[in-house]
Swiss-Prot record:
Pfam families: THF_DHG_CYH, THF_DHG_CYH_C. InterPro entries: Aminoacid_DH-like_N_sf (IPR046346), NAD(P)-bd_dom_sf (IPR036291), THF_DH/CycHdrlase (IPR000672), THF_DH/CycHdrlase_cat_dom (IPR020630), THF_DH/CycHdrlase_CS (IPR020867), THF_DH/CycHdrlase_NAD-bd_dom (IPR020631). GO terms for cellular component: cytosol. Catalyzes the oxidation of 5,10-methylenetetrahydrofolate to 5,10-methenyltetrahydrofolate and then the hydrolysis of 5,10-methenyltetrahydrofolate to 10-formyltetrahydrofolate. NADP(+) binds at residues 166-168, 191. Homodimer. Keywords: Amino-acid biosynthesis, Histidine biosynthesis, Hydrolase, Methionine biosynthesis, Multifunctional enzyme, NADP, One-carbon metabolism, Oxidoreductase, Purine biosynthesis. It comes from Salinispora arenicola (strain CNS-205). The gene is folD1. Its EC number is 1.5.1.5, 3.5.4.9. This is Bifunctional protein FolD 1. It catalyses: (6R)-5,10-methylene-5,6,7,8-tetrahydrofolate + NADP(+) = (6R)-5,10-methenyltetrahydrofolate + NADPH; (6R)-5,10-methenyltetrahydrofolate + H2O = (6R)-10-formyltetrahydrofolate + H(+). Belongs to the tetrahydrofolate dehydrogenase/cyclohydrolase family. GO terms for biological process: L-histidine biosynthetic process; methionine biosynthetic process; purine nucleotide biosynthetic process; tetrahydrofolate interconversion. Pathway: One-carbon metabolism; tetrahydrofolate interconversion. The lineage of its organism: Bacteria, Bacillati, Actinomycetota, Actinomycetes, Micromonosporales.
């Protein structure tokens, strides 16, 4: 068996095109364009690259973008003040705090300074609760991107056994909740899990989201399973040993070109959602 690649690039392009059409309609109706404010603290090269890509995608679809670059030694209090100011700015529809932030920053406090109505990255407690209880809100972008990929490839979820490797607040935990809402049977695995291989071997769907290169070995994958690799590590490799996993899985996301492009497209789509709610 050779797995079919889940093409995040093509799907993201389709979502960006539909988002651009929505931006045009919003501009026609409201006389302004949706606006995304991006806040970046420090000089991390990867973070600067990610922000540049997001700003470029905003330009492509017609979303106004504001970029705020803060010094590496910015304090939590200073960052919170910036985020609160943006939250109260009626011209801003969405706010993205690029993470990870420098170690002196209390990231939780920073996230909670974002108005939930502008939390288009889905990082506040309010957004997390909305995902858990099925309320209207903004899903964390990478989990939402994964769900779109699964739906695009008609992956059945109800009654299926899903194993999520990773328990971060913005990826592992929320993707598990979204899968649970679709009636999957979800198991979380993490650094303290014993016999990870046995858990993975029972999964119909594996979501790897732990940030450890090739942690999930290809021979662990159940024949015919679906594998979503949300990891992105040095050397352009994911959390899954892709070469061997592809010989057992039915569907697998490539790294790069799978989850990443869809995540950015979801961010922009949710920015337009926020603008439409703000009016």
């Amino acid at each position: 068996m050779t797995a079919t690649l889940m093409d995040g690039r093509t799907l993201s392009r389709q979502l960006l095109e539909s988002t651009a059409e929505r931006v045009t309609g919003f501009h026609r109706s409201h006389g302004r364009r949706p606006c995304l404010a991006t806040v970046l603290v420090g000089e991390d090269p990867a973070s600067h690259t990610y922000v540049r890509i997001k700003v470029n995608r905003c330009t492509e679809v017609g979303i106004d973008s504001r970029r705020f670059d803060l010094p590496t030694l910015t304090t939590t209090e200073q960052l919170v003040r910036v985020l609160r100011d943006l939250s109260s700015d009626s011209a801003v529809d969405g706010i993205l705090l690029q993470h990870p932030t420098p170690p002196q920053i209390d990231e939780h406090a920073a996230f909670e300074a974002i108005d939930p109505s502008k939390d288009v990255d889905g990082v506040t407690g309010t957004s997390f609760a909305a995902m858990a209880f099925g309320y209207r809100g903004f899903a964390s972008c990478t989990p939402a991107a994964i769900m779109r990929l699964l739906d695009a490839y008609d992956v059945p979820l109800s009654g299926q056994r899903a194993v999520v490797v990773g328990r971060s607040a913005i990826l592992g935990k929320p993707i598990g909740m979204l899968l649970l809402a679709r009636d999957a049977t979800v198991t979380y695995c993490h650094s303290r899990t014993t016999d990870l291989a046995a858990h993975v071997a029972e999964a119909d769907l594996v979501v790897a989201a732990v940030g450890v290169p090739h942690l999930v070995r290809g021979e662990w994958i159940k024949p015919g399973a679906v594998v979503v690799d949300a990891g992105y590590n040095a050397g352009n490799v994911g959390d899954v040993q892709a070469a061997t996993a592809a010989n057992r899985a039915s569907l697998i996301t490539p790294v790069p070109g799978g989850v990443g492009p869809m995540t950015i497209a979801v961010l922009l789509a949710q920015t337009v959602d926020a603008a439409e709610r703000h009016g």
